[in-house]
Amino acid sequence: MTLKEFKDQNKLSYKALAKLVGASDATVARRWCLEKSHKDAMIPDRHFMTSIIEATMGQVMPNDFYRD
């Protein structure tokens, strides 16, 4: 499952998603949810990746940021 799918399925705003994973800015969370081909897309660093795995209870994993 992608982070965007998790966000949408749980009806979270980007601000709520950022807070859930410990990011200080909703813009960062928004960039994590963009298609990987988008010029502004970002992949979370190790710290946030761990937070994302924990916050989503394993529904979003690192490989989900790399698949098409």
Regions found by a protein language model. Give the residues of each.
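Basic side chains
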Residues: 4-7, 30-31, 46
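A short, Lys/Arg-rich alpha-helix, primarily the initiator
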Residues: 1-21, 50, 54, 59-63
